[in-house]
Amino acid sequence: MGNINSICLNNNGKYRIDSISCSLEGCKLNSKELVENMVALVDKYPLTQLLIIRECKLKQIPVNITNLSNLSELILSDNKLSQLPWSLPPPFKPNTLLSMASITNENLVRLDLSNNRFTEFPSSVFVLPNLKQLILCNNQLTNMNVTLCGGTSNNNGAHQPHIACQLEELKLSNNNFTIFPSIIGDQLTTLKSLDLSGNTITSLPNSFSNLVSLTSLNLKSNKFTCFPPSLCTLDKLVHLNLSCNQILVSPSDHTLGVSLLPSLEKLELQHNRFAHFPMDILEIVSLRVLKLQDNDIDKIPDKIGNLLNLNELFLSENKITQLPSTIGELINLRKLYLEYNKIGSLPQEFSKLSKLNILILHNNDLKFVPDQLHSLSQLLRLSLDENQLSSSDQKLIKSEGSLALIKRKNKLNYGSTMNGTGTTSSSGSASTSTHGSINKTTDILLSSVTLNNSILNQINNNNNNNNNNNNNNNNNNNSSNNNSGTNSLSSTPNGTGKSKKKLTHLTISRSLFRGNSSNLESEKEDFINKKQQQQQQQQQQQQQQQQQQQQQQQQQQQQQQQQQQLGSTASPSTASPITSHITVNSTVLDFEDDIQKMQLGLEALSNLETSIGSNNSGGGDSMNGSGGNINNSGGSGSGCGTISGSTTKQRRGSVFLPPTNAFKLSPNVVSSSYNTLPASVMSGLLQQQNLENGGVGSGSGSGSPIISANSICNSNSSSSNSLLKPPIINTTNLSTSPNLLSQSSTSFLNLPPLNQSSTNSFLPPQHQHHHHHSNLSQSLSINNLAHRLPTSLSSSSLSSNNTYDSLQFQQQQQHHHHNHNNHQNSNQPLATIVPSFSKFKNSFDQLLEEQDFSKKKRETLQKLSKEQKWNLLLQYRNSTLNMLNMKEHSNNSNNNQSIKNSTIIASTTTTTTTNGESLDGSSIQQQITKNSNFQSSRFYIDNLTSKTDISLVKEVHDFLKESGPEVSIFIGMGGIESLLGILQFNLDNAQLQFDEEKVGYCLLCLKILVECTAKSVITTNNSLNLVTMFLTSASKYIIDIIIDIYDELLRLQVIGVSVVLDSLINFQKVKGLSSPYVPLVALLRNPIIEMPTKTTVFKIINFLIYSFSVLEERFSVICSLLKVGILEVIGMFRALPHTSYSLRFELDLFEEVLDSDESELVKKIGRKEVLKRMSNEDNDLSKQSSKQSMDFVRVVMVSAGYGDLKIDLDERTSYANVIDFIQSNYQIKYSIDRYGLFVPAIGSLVLDGSILQSSGSQSRWVDPSKSLIDNGLSNEIVEFKMKPMQIQVLQSVVVVVATNHQKEDIIKEFTIDPQLKCFEIVQYLRTRLDSSSPAFQRKISVLTEDEDEDYESDIYGVYCFSSLESYDQGSWYPLNSRFLDFNPTNTPTIIDVKLMERPLRVLFSGTEKLMKFNPYVPVSELIKEIKNEIHLKINIEDYGISYVPNVSSSNLSSLIIEETWLDPTKTLLDHNDMKCSVVQFKFKPRTVSVMVLVESGIEIPTTDTPYQFVNTNSISEIIEKICTPHQLNPLSHSLYISDCQGQKIKLLSRQNCLRDQQVNNGDHLIITSKQKDLPSDFNVWDEPNDSSETITYSKDRRVSSVTLNKLIEKLTSPEYTQDSEMKTIFLSSYRSIITPSVLLSKLMERHTIPTLVDKERGKLIQRKTRLLIKSWLELETTKNREEVITLLVQNMPAQSIEDDGLKELTELFVDLSTKSYSSILPIVIGELPKCKIPKIIDSYVTFADMDEIEIARQLSLLTFPLYSRIETSELLNQRWSKPGGGPNIMSVVGLFNKISNWVSFTIVNQPKLRDRAVVYGKMVKIANAFYELRNYHLLMAIISGLNASPVLRLKYTKGKLSKNLKDNLDTLEELMSTQSSMKNYRADLAAASPPAIPFMGFHLSDLVFIDEGNQQLCDSRINFKKLEMYKKTIATLQNFSLFPYQFTPVPIIQNYFLDYKIVADKPIYEMSLSAEPRNAERYDIQ
């Protein structure tokens, strides 16, 4: 392939070769060379399967192409072919049988000959035996006369050619056919797809009906005038295109003639002449897509509602004025295009189109926004432009888009508030609405999904306030929103106030006890460590109990065996191992069948029955029939509940191994329910996080709820690697930046185990690193619940071998934040950011093609302006256009990996990147060309087929990740459809040709597209349904990708939920499952799925639940999940030894909504009815008709963590039988004696004030002494739950003994439900304890209307201790945990209800931190704790704690609220008005004592008594206090800091206070006369207002002169608009007037804001000051910058916690002093110019041997480093003329003198005239080379050497020069002429582009003139015009110093000049005289 490589280097084109494919495009070789290289290509790669030669002007194909025996696809489009190499030589006998193998490519399947020059049909293609697809579009064919293929003659003597192939697809579009080719209907009967568009055919022959296999027919743009009747016989036709013809509708019956097309799904009839809607179309009920645009239809018939399957309807460019009401019956319609009609309104029924995604209504006659649009909750694209709407509506549409207009009207249900009652029906009808029926639940899934906007707002507010909710961690434990049965937040319509909240039980994990351990691991450890002895006793007791239970089980088993031997009547398959009196009804196992189906996957369905039978034996509804134990192939790990013995068949195709960066292009911020969590849940979650991190109940007295590395439990299960190891969090970073908590995220690299189960996805060791998007990032922060993206995210340090380094992690976070913002703002129009037309031209052309506008309309649209075209494009593709504004990027380091399985032979595109920064410090945006490794979008679209090689699919994956704007074009061209086509092919051929790797990469591509533009994927037909079908895959990686896609989709409000539910329901129907949630639960139980993926699955489940706003609908979904075994899965996850925080979070969230909804529904319909819904009663009723009726009892065990159990009763079934059965078949954590059977009451719940009595008089506990029938339980439902327990409570009361009040401790007993949480116990006991108890030490406040909940309840807790003597050794129970979790064995303990540590949000230095304080200690101790927490060296006496008292909103208008300081001597409890306040730890004003001295001459008596001033008083106030008593004018005096002798040290600024100027107790001040103050002493803030004394302007209003202080003021003023230019001028030349230290001191003065200045304005000034400092460093040159950095380090600001900007200034100083600066910008170019190395003889080179151009290059390389090192300070005040003042300038000047001297010496050193002339000419050539390189400095050096007197006098030598050289020299001399101040040089330099080197001598002269011709000061003001002139000259020099020359150094040439020693002028002149003596004649010269 050497020739191919040479092609690549010398000609434009793209080449791509791998093991089986070769692509050559756009080659410019001549025909002969091209054919020769093709011959070489065929010989070199004989195994090629795909050969592409496109756009190469190929005229013939080499004959040896037939040697490619494996060739299956040959693409020769866009060439000049007219014949093929397979022609058979005539004559050819008809009956001769030939073997074609020797002359054809017998394996060729696809042949593309489009866009060539065929005038006759290439008959030879029919000799290709396996040809399936033939493309001959855009040729010049007029017929298909096939005569050269042999064949036979028919009865009529007509020749019938022999056709060896069986074509399936034939494309003949855009040829010259006038008659339909008869051979198609006669012999090509195997065709499935036929394209004859763009011809002039008028009719179809009768033989056309022979094409019985035809599924797609395209007859677009022909001359049909009626519907071809022969089409009606095509039963398999799916797609028919008859657009752009002249077909008419029958005027009588308005019919077209369409009939008998039962399979037709897509019908295209646009651009015809329909005056009426074709009525017979409405009978084709299979239609999914109907296109009728650009006709003359004015009315849509009512029967349009018949098309129930219609998905897309195109009716644009008609004359429609109204739509029929029946259009609302098109319930599956997703896309509706109605633009360019005359529609004035929409029918009411239009609102029924609930699935509508795209609605285009622009250019109609709408006069108002239709109300019907408000109900279309799934709209993704809406266009209402160019209607007759109000001007305000039109303005909003233009600026924000049509969807934004709908949202603004607050009617679209994108986030409607929940029903305040929690249900849409009365309690009477509630029981029938969601009666546990799975089918009924499925029916309402899509119609009832709404999101609660108030919840979303609440969460957003929580996140905006960072950790604000942390203060309410305990508040919300027992206080939430309980409005008539809903568990969500209610909001007032206008948002003006909050409705009053009532106390409720809702909080995180507030669930009935499920038999699971508490998830608060860190709290339990603290508690267990304090009670170690007690636990040991408990363990001993448990062991004894277990032994007793084992003995009982053995006895019961023996009894059962004996009874079975006696002839028990129970069925062997359902008999209990305990007793035969219990028969388990099999209906409870119905849903297990569905789970088993899902676990087995696609290949194991044949083994379904045996697998289910083996697992269901033994009774019970546990996951494996053995009591719910986890069977995980030898150990506990990632899976739950496997099916023993199931095997899978090995699939064909490769195994999918995802790339390491396949999962989550950027890691997500994980939350469990996206944007829909209730506020009460949110607050509970915040507390849960706090508890997890050891923040509550630790008894430490203080601490912050930050994440500690020690508080996160690593997963280290030995049996599985699927459990994630959470990251180690850098607590230092978190503690110093609390905002990090709300911004943290992480990513994980999993090491999946080598798969030993039934899957073919074996991972070799080198592929075990699997980058997963784990939800454990949730462990970092709950505050990210409302924003899963990623936004800008900060990464914590990750100490795991499986994580990326922090730099890569941050880049991924920033990238995912961008993807997330795409989702958030996808509806925002981009009209305000119109890119160049070249960027969106392709998209615009695609739009015109897609929408298929009429020719006239296209011409009109093409004439639109750029802005109008962009606006039109926005109407259709607003979800992808944001990509057009993205910068294309290329990662050079990854270029070699972009196409992993391909070798890039060549890419002739040279990428040049130029980085630069403007002089004002703003960086120029980097411009980088597209990654040349990728092909165009069109290439991928054309080649993405079911036969596509996996390498191309991988390349598409990389292309979508890295190609930016090209992705939009890829989508517009049908890229999504191409990917779905590959998936559909693999799904249809799963048993034969399933390619797992290809499927995996296609899904990865879709995942990328979902992240970038989810709406485009959603609006693609059947996309998500198809993706969901792969949930049965045996590859865990494919499952992971699908779950990631779900996760991403659910970020879209409303539509995301609907799409996911829709796909699950479709999956349910296709697979015949009983519930749409079966796939999700099956994944949770699948052992091959890893825990991070299972966590995401559970997160999806939670979000689906929370998306239902109506209580009963939500509970119906929960019940559906209960029936498919979700509780068993939860129990198994809880039992795992190491469970991630994020998974526990999801489990808690599910239990939260289950419990809260259950409790609310119990209040409405009664507990018995609720239990019925939670059970499988409906399934039993459906089967009772076929079974003999008998008594039964249904036992609901939800509270124990299981489902329900239906037991058939007989007279012998006893209470003990049931309990024993449960104990034997289920894992009940606690002693079975603590449980009982409870019979709930009938009817709604009526509370009597006790939280223990949960039902009316009919509720009761089952009597254990009676049989179940005697207990009246026949056909009843009972609940298996824990019995009440007794607790001891300490109550301290005050008694009177002999008139003395004494405290006495009393212990009382109370009965409580052990499943209660501690905060509920607090609530309960506070209503029953004596009022003198510590629980009442603080009064319960009365809620005001604007308060969210009762704040007091959160600060009371349960303090546990064993006896009064050991009271101090007790522990706090976490409020959110169950009492039973910390007292599992009911050990006798005493509890005390008292105030807990109080959490406060402390604000200091702009940072907010949650801390906890003992409410009983003085505030002074709190101040010390805060100081220790912030780790700053501050004077504690200067600081205090302040807060703003809470005031009711009704009083805000009449009160002026002032902050209050906490009294250090009091406790927190003494400050009743600081409830819910954020306290501030800040500087507290105090009095300082100073001595004031008086300067002589001032009539103020001296005194030894110190003055007392408040340190917040300004100096002007203090001067006034001193002068006023003595009748002195304060404005005439100043105040200095002095020493004790009165020596002035520093002038105090009049505007700043004592504290700002570090005046402390004992300091000395001296008051002086202001007249003696020097200008340099004035503070910037003391500068007077603008006047002629401080600033003057020129006529053009430019600054002419200005004082230093005024200049600093202007540069940092928020109002000043000319600061950018002034800043550059000043910073470039400030060293001419002041030193860097003076400038820094002035800037720090300006940054210190006086107290009296407005705070917001002060922050703006500080910000501009910091920006000025940053620009200062950026504009400094290297050495000067080092000097300034040293000053920054020496003047680092002092520590402060005030929000005074010092923290930001310190961070800036640190950043600037550690930042790396680059003075020269790198230039990325192609290959460097080839250097010309001279001949070297004995290590010596002569001048004659050196090339002139190479000399110029090497001298330029020597000059530029010297030139680029010139410092700014060297150019000011003629510093270079002073000794040592300008070393770099002198180096450049010295090189100039050396070269000039060398020129003169080299010329005169030649003894002969001829040699001198040659050298002279060579010097001219060098000078010209310097000019070409824009090295003006050395160009002038050459000219200077040539014009030196020793050379100038050599007239004979110069006379020997050629005319060209003389002219060249004259031109150069004219360019560098000094006349008119070097006008020519100035102009040429101004037009030059870098790299270049100016002539330094000229610019130094300019600087001398500037310095000497302009004074420095004008009346003590800076001459700013002089600085401006300085800047102009310096900028010219510095601009070219950034871009170096790019040549290869040649050391021997450089050393030649470096070693040259300057020769004195006198010897050179003598040599000149010797060469040409004075007055010598020509003949005297040698």
UniProtKB/Swiss-Prot annotation:
UniProt cross-references to PROSITE patterns, sorted A to Z: GBD_FH3, LRR, RASGEF, RASGEF_CAT, RASGEF_NTER
GBD/FH3 domain ranges (all copies): 832-1236
Disordered as annotated region, ranges: 414-436, 457-532, 615-654, 756-778, 807-829
The protein's name in its UniProt record: Ras guanine nucleotide exchange factor V
Domain of life: Eukaryota
Coiled coil (UniProt feature): 515-567
Gene that this polypeptide is encoded by: gefV
Biased composition (Gly residues): 616-642
Alphabetized InterPro entries for the sequence: ARM-like, ARM-type_fold, GBD/FH3_dom, GTPase-bd, Leu-rich_rpt, Leu-rich_rpt_typical-subtyp, LRR_dom_sf, LRR_R13L4/SHOC2-like
Extracellular-side positions: 1-1831
Role, per record: Promotes the exchange of Ras-bound GDP by GTP.
GO molecular function, one term: small GTPase binding
Taxonomic lineage of the native organism: Eukaryota, Amoebozoa, Evosea, Eumycetozoa, Dictyostelia
